[in-house]
A protein has these predicted regions:
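PAPS-dependent sulfotransferase catalytic domain
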Residues: 1-176, 222-279
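PAPS/PAP-binding and catalytic site of the sulfotransferase fold
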Residues: 41-53, 176-200, 208, 216
Length: 279
């Protein structure tokens, strides 16, 4: 549950051109970032609720792209973000080395979500097919080649994950997987709250987890992108919040495609020591 917004300038390989615009943003040590290749829509729902102590007002009245703005999206330049009270919430798809200078200076905390790249591919394939502002994915074979070689928006999944896993000051980075959140959302919310130094009662944690269940978020027009005109996102082709499950790649990839994916994955990730839940 995390993809590019329609008002973002999308390219095939990434958004490096936006970095300079954001490079001078004033941040604070208490600013929060959800930096991910997937699951940002989820974090745009969860983190404001943790911050508000479970008050649903913001997530029911404010679109998620204004509630937790995208660093790489031009709308962030007109929201007067520096005037928001600290801690401020941001989301981004940037690679670690693409972050603005103020990020490395002020050292805000980072919540980094990872997901089985096979499911990331599956989700991306459907998303590219419904978003008019992205390059048409064409055949699944064609899109798979692009995905594995990093010729998609925001570049290589492999480089993105490895870059953030090697980030400095890892005590300020929380690594969590989409799978963990699917399997036990209440525990995930509690862990995220602890990382954000927010003291929540079990009742509030339960309330947040219930609201942020996929089936409930799918009904929230402030989070399901139904506010976006169909000329940009045609949700008759594929819903923005599509399935919210683990392992849908098994219904998408052919045997040959899965074998190719596995071979590339083994080669690209052979030196990574982090234990992924999907391995």
């Amino acid at each position: 549950m995390g993809r590019a917004a329609p008002h973002r300038r999308a390219t095939e390989t990434g958004a490096a051109g936006c970095v300079q615009v954001t490079g001078s943003w004033p941040l604070t040590e208490s600013a929060w970032w959800a930096s991910t290749t997937t699951g940002t829509t989820w974090m745009q729902e969860i983190t404001p609720l943790i911050q508000s102590g479970g008050d649903l007002t913001s997530v029911l009245t404010q679109p998620n792209w204004d509630r937790v703005p995208w660093l790489e999206e031009h709308r962030a330049q007109v929201l007067n973000l520096e005037q928001r009270p600290s801690p401020r919430l941001f989301a981004t798809h940037f690679h670690c080395d693409m972050m603005p200078q103020s990020f490395f200076k002020d050292k805000p905390k980072v919540i980094y979500i990872m997901r089985n790249p096979r499911d990331v591919f599956t989700s991306s394939y459907h998303y590219y097919g419904m978003a008019s502002f992205l390059v048409n994915p064409q055949s699944q074979d064609n899109f798979l080649q692009k995905f594995l070689s990093g010729k998609v928006m925001f570049g290589s999944w492999f480089d993105h994950v490895k870059g953030w896993l090697n980030a400095k000051d890892q005590d300020r980075v929380m690594y969590i997987s989409y799978e963990e959140m699917i399997w036990d959302l209440r525990d995930s919310v509690a862990r995220i709250a602890l990382f954000m130094d927010s003291s929540l009662t079990p009742k509030v944690v339960e309330k947040i987890a219930d609201h942020c269940m996929f089936k409930n978020m799918k009904q929230n027009k402030m989070s399901n992108y139904s506010l976006v005109p169909s000329e940009f996102m045609d949700q008759t082709k594929s819903e923005f919040l599509r399935k919210g499950v683990v392992g849908d790649w098994k219904n998408q990839l052919t045997v040959a495609q899965a074998e190719l994916f596995d071979a590339v994955y083994r080669d690209k990730m052979k030196d990574v020591k982090y234990k992924f839940v999907w391995n």
